[in-house]
Amino acid sequence: MKADKPEQQVVISGVGQSDIGRRLNRDPLELTLDACLAAIEDAGLTTADIDGISTYPGTTAQPPGFTGAGAIDVFDALRLELGWWSGGIERPGQLGAVVDGAMAVAFGLAKHVLCFRSVFEGSAQGAGGRAAVMPGGDGRKNVPRASGFMEWVLPYGAPSASSWIAMMAQRHFYEFGTTSEQLGQIAVNARKNAALNPKAIYTDPMSLDDYLNSRVITTPLHLFDCDVPCDGGTAMIVSHVDTIPDLRKPPIRVEALGTALRGRPSWDQWDDLTTMAMRDASAQLWSRTDMKPSEVQLAEMYDGFSFITMCWLEAMGFCAKGESGPFVEGGERIATQGGQLPLNTHGGQLSAGRLHGFGFLHEACVQLWGEAGDRQVPGNPEVGVAAAGGGPMAGVLLLTTSR
């Protein structure tokens, strides 16, 4: 394996997660701190050891509930003494915060960086659902003038990513013969895995017929193709390899990473509507390691909408371009027990809740440490990927317990 990349000076030493719920109605900073303190303890560290902090998206103006706390909030609440910190939304996807932390560690700006993401979208939306927190959600009055990308979608009644992703999925259906029955396997697999996750939002059994009979949101996407807003926080500690003797348990090494910002900063103006920025992020990742897709034993990949996961499967080389439909058909290849590539083993955002990217990295680490309980992938997996992002931005990490 190549050993000359900065990310290979980095390990994940601990992870933590708060309570997760559809609507917890708790102080979002409290949820954030629960996750951060759990991650610090998991690594065998104390707050005095943390000398860096990184988060996405910080406290930037976003729909209510989109962010639970910023870097300064956590810095102050935990009384940290930092040599480096970062927080913001203009990154290659949600995991850009972890990539930033990894680079800070690799280049000597910090030894232990606390990376976190928290949301309280479920409580913020309340009974009004997503429309309650979207610009112009009342549809009649107090609608601000659209600007930027929204100028081109809001007048046509398409302010939601479901509309943009549906357009891409429709093109994939047309070009490659992908079917709703195939797409539905992403959601059915997620629900099956969520049933074994005590923190998952939705755990009731769901058949493919249940999926197909659910209401259509934007053709071809059904209700269960869309992730579930929730409340919760997730955190992880990124540490330098030189600190391994000080850690509580064997660390997870970052073998390679990939990031990308491609095309126009929108979701609808692409050279190829059947793919997204994960095509380029994945190519970058594989160029930074001698490992191959066939060596990956589990994949935790973004499912804000189920079609995004299919794009990740193709981009990462787990199947050929246009072949994600046949790859997931029947669900056997992506099953946690006995599957060729166990996929979204915690239930993903479709059933476990929209922790907005960080939940995938948390689950990959839990699995590689063998701490996933009833949903544990058998055979002591040593290599996994965690990926987040869609549209023009994407980030992915290749993780291993040995090098």
How should each PLM-predicted stretch be described?
Residues M1-G93, D100, A104, M168, ...:
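Conserved active-site "lid/cap" helical segment
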Residues M1-L29, A38, Q185, V216-D280, ...:
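Condensing-enzyme catalytic core mediating Claisen C-C bond formation in acyl metabolism
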Residues D4-Q8, T60-G126, A131-W164, Y202-C226, ...:
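Conserved catalytic cysteine-centered active-site region
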Residues L24-R26, A124-R130, A195-K199, P265-W267, ...:
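Short acidic, glycine/serine/threonine-rich loops at helix termini
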Residues T47-P57, W84-I89, V113-S118, Q182-N189, ...:
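Beta-strand segments within the central parallel beta-sheet cores of soluble alpha/beta enzyme folds
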Residues A61-A69, W267-W270, D303-P326, M393-L398:
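Short glycine/threonine-rich loop-to-helix capping motif typified by GTGT followed
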Residues I89-V119, S162-L196, M236-D242, A352-A372:
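Active-site-proximal alpha-helical scaffold in enzymes
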Residues D272-R279, A283-S306, M310, A315-F318, ...:
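Extended C-terminal subregions enriched in glycine
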